[in-house]
Amino acid sequence: VKAGFDGSSLEMVLHGAAPCPPAVKRSLIEWWGPKITEYYGSTEASVITLINSEEWLAKGGSVGKALPNMEIIVVDNDGQRCGPNAEGTLYFRSLMGMDFEYHNAPSKTAEAHLEPGVYTTGDVGYLDDEGYLWLSDRKIDMIISGGVNIYPAEIEGVLGGHPMVADVAVIGVPNEEFGEEVKAIVVPNDGVTGDDDLVGILAAHCRENLAGFKCPRSFDFADELPRTGTGKVQKRKLREPYWEGRERSI
């Protein structure tokens, strides 16, 4: 495939919205050169961080440092600021004084704000000693199994890096003993059959690369994953069939 394309005129590739599997991104940098810049942001806050190819190769998995006009604040469950490498809810402040409110939704606006001008979009992560931001996941997607918090993004990163996987989403499904358990919904690569053999291969891959409690208890296969217009996986749609008839809301 590579031989059929001349990338000499390519100057920069900017990507965001959802993480790119590390193995895929590394191969693209090897192919195109250090021309890929990743951003992290939101509709509410616009662009918050940037990381170029050289930085990413040294800090693989980070989404970069805050732009000069943005401040990142990490807050624990008690509302206290976290130090370096301590995980918490991410809040942001525009140093230009910009803020937002949700249209006709004052309670939602209030819930999103720690104080005037300091807001969250529900992401969880941490800042390292050098100020690079690392995302864990969105709170809304977090799986709580037996009282333990499990973030799907880490599991998706491991499975997404397997050569037999084209796409993957990890969700929490009902478990009578633990409340939730981890399920992976996998889109197999072209020419790969989603069967028990593939389940065994992927389960072994997870055991080699993840803590035991993070490994999926089950796998389902799909032709494609439901996505929004901006490419984000619609996990609520994926969870709905498994939680139908349950008292818990998803």
Predicted regions and their residues:
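Short, P/G- and charge-enriched loop/turn segments at secondary-structure junctions
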Residues: 56-63, 111
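Gly/Ser/Thr-rich phosphate-binding loop
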Residues: 1-58, 71, 78-80
